[in-house]
Amino acid sequence: MSSQHFQGRFEVEFKYRLSDVDAFTCALAALNPEVMLEDNQEQDSYFDTPEHSLAAEGKSLVIRTMQPSGIQLWIVKGPEADRCEAVNITDADKAASMLRTLGYRQVLAISKRRSIYFVGPFHVTRDHLEGIGDFAELAIMTDDEALLPDYRQQLQDLATRLGLSSAQLETRSYRTLCEQSLTLNSEKVPS
């Protein structure tokens, strides 16, 4: 794993909804990316207080497990849109237990199939969320906040090279998309 791709306190990220996964995959292959992993199953467990105080502050606390790669992460996002920190952990179950001991509870679980590639300094993910859709995320992490505007432009240029348009841009987080889907599905269930 190229760990330098995932270091930093800030993350510039653009998410695109894919209408043609094969066309995107072909465009990505033409850039000769380095493959980190393909078709891993990720399970993201979101934790918050019973009062949802983290969500109210624009923060997310996530324990992520990835199989078959075996990667386990503790992730904190927010409150700023570009703020994201992650650290490798060795026991996701123990970390979740510790959070519950501290009064947090799991408020959402998201499963996705993810492939991660590197194109120069950028990481490109191809994600599938059952019932939600297919997405590409283009991102870079840094500790230097002054670089964020330049990285935004470079990622938009990369998106163009990958055949992605601003019409495909998805500004909602996977958490929001899943919560909205759950709300819609619960409204469809007859009482």
UniProtKB/Swiss-Prot annotation:
GO annotation, cellular component aspect: cytoplasm
Subcellular location per the Swiss-Prot or TrEMBL entry: Cytoplasm
Temperature dependence: Optimum temperature is 65 degrees Celsius.
Listed GO biological process terms: cAMP biosynthetic process
SMART domains found in the cross-reference section: CYTH
Activity regulation remarks: Inhibited by GTP.
Sequence ranges assigned to domain CYTH in this UniProt record: 9-180
Catalytic activity: ATP = 3',5'-cyclic AMP + diphosphate
EC number: 4.6.1.1
Chief place of localization: cytoplasm
Listed SUPFAM superfamilies: CYTH-like phosphatases
Active site, renumbered: Y46
Alphabetized UniProt keyword annotations: ATP-binding, cAMP biosynthesis, Cytoplasm, Lyase, Nucleotide-binding
A GO MF label: ATP binding
Cited InterPro entries: Adenylyl_cyclase_CyaB, CYTH-like_dom_sf, CYTH_domain
Stored PROSITE patterns: CYTH (PS51707)
Deletion phenotype: Cells lacking this gene show no impair of cAMP biosynthesis.
pH dependency: Optimum pH is 9.5.
Pfam families: CYTH
Similarity comment: family membership: Belongs to the adenylyl cyclase CyaB family.
NCBIfam families associated with the record: cyaB
Chain's role: In vitro, CyaB catalyzes the biosynthesis of cyclic AMP (cAMP) from ATP. It seems that under the physiological conditions CyaB has no function in cAMP processes. In vitro, it is also able to hydrolyze substrates such as thiamine triphosphate (ThTP) and inorganic triphosphate (PPPi) at a low rate. It has a slight preference for ThTP over ATP and PPPi in the presence of manganese ions. This PPPase activity is probably not of physiological importance.
Protein name: Adenylate cyclase CyaB
Organism: Aeromonas hydrophila
UniProt lineage: Bacteria, Pseudomonadati, Pseudomonadota, Gammaproteobacteria, Aeromonadales
UniProt gene name: cyaB
